[in-house]
A protein has these predicted regions:
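Extended interfacial segments that mediate partner engagement and assembly in macromolecular machines
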Residues: 27-70
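"Short basic amphipathic alpha-helical interaction patches in structured regions
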Residues: 44-46, 96-99, 140-147
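Cys/His-rich short segments
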Residues: 1-27
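C-terminal folded domains that constitute the principal catalytic or ligand-binding module
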Residues: 126-127, 134-244
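Short, glycine/acidic-enriched capping/hinge loops at junctions between secondary-structure elements
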Residues: 14-17, 39-44, 94
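S-adenosyl-L-methionine/SAH cofactor-binding core of RNA-modifying enzymes
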Residues: 53-138
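Short, acidic/turn-prone active-site loops that include or flank metal/cofactor-
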Residues: 35-36, 62, 88, 155-160
């Protein structure tokens, strides 16, 4: 039996860690690759979604005909940005990025990025996050080159993932749920998101996922659970469970 909200086995349901939902005043959109949708054992996009109020998951490989996505992109109350690294990517400290958050008719606010009037008239930031492996992320970009025409946003700082049982292609690569967490923290530092927003549930549920997964893998190695991997050296030794 699976939970139909977090899509994890009932035994390992994580929904209780997602309440109350985080309302950061940001609309997160997750473009979830079909393979990621099937890998709910360790996927973090759905966990991020159930933690974040006003977030949406759009599943697929080809999004050029996705009416929901284009309705969102065409809504002037949102500022859509693609969370994607690159030399042309902004970060939250970039003045040009901050100015984009202001409506075109708010010239008087453009030099007052943290004033009450500027904050009250800001557009809602809408980060678009590709939820997939890095290989599948490239496939989504290949099939949807229009995404690269969106403003790109990346981190102002470097972060390392705590996803201990996954090997990212580069040290600076982080999971979907970590992306949401670090983005909210940087937006708070830039005074774009309110200081009283608590983003910690994202990391709490993520750490619980890691601990549960490693504990289950260790039980398989010990013969306490049926193995689903056959013989694979990655899954035939006891792993240390981090003390977060």
């Amino acid at each position: 039996m699976r939970c139909y909200k977090c899509f994890r086995p009932k035994e390992f349901c994580l929904c209780s860690f997602a309440t109350p939902q985080i309302d950061a005043g940001v609309k997160f959109i997750f473009l979830m690759h079909p393979k990621e949708a099937k890998r709910q054992r360790t996927g973090t996009g759905r966990l991020a979604h159930i933690c974040l109020a006003n977030s949406e998951i759009l599943q697929g490989l080809e999004f050029s005909q996705n009416t929901r996505l284009f309705d969102l992109l065409g809504d002037e109350k949102f500022l859509p940005v693609l969370m994607y690294p690159g030399n042309d990517a902004w970060n939250v400290n970039d003045e040009n990025f901050v100015k984009l958050l202001l409506p075109k008719n708010s010239e008087e606010n453009k030099n007052e990025k943290n004033s009450a009037s500027a904050i009250s008239t800001r557009k809602t930031l809408m980060p678009i996050i590709i939820d997939a492996t890095w290989f599948c992320s490239r496939k989504i970009i290949e099939h949807n080159e229009f995404l690269l025409r969106l403003p790109k946003l990346s981190f102002a700082k470097n972060y390392s993932s705590i996803f201990t049982f996954k090997h990212e292609p580069r040290p600076e690569c982080v999971s979907t749920i970590e992306t949401c967490y670090y983005l909210i923290k940087e937006l708070q530092a830039a005074k774009i998101v309110a200081q009283n927003v608590d983003a910690e549930p994202l990391m709490t549920i993520f750490k619980k996922l890691i601990s549960d997964q490693l504990r289950a893998e260790n039980e398989r190695v010990q013969g306490l659970r049926p193995s689903t991997h056959g013989y694979d050296w990655k899954y035939n030794k006891i792993r240390e469970i981090p003390n977060f």
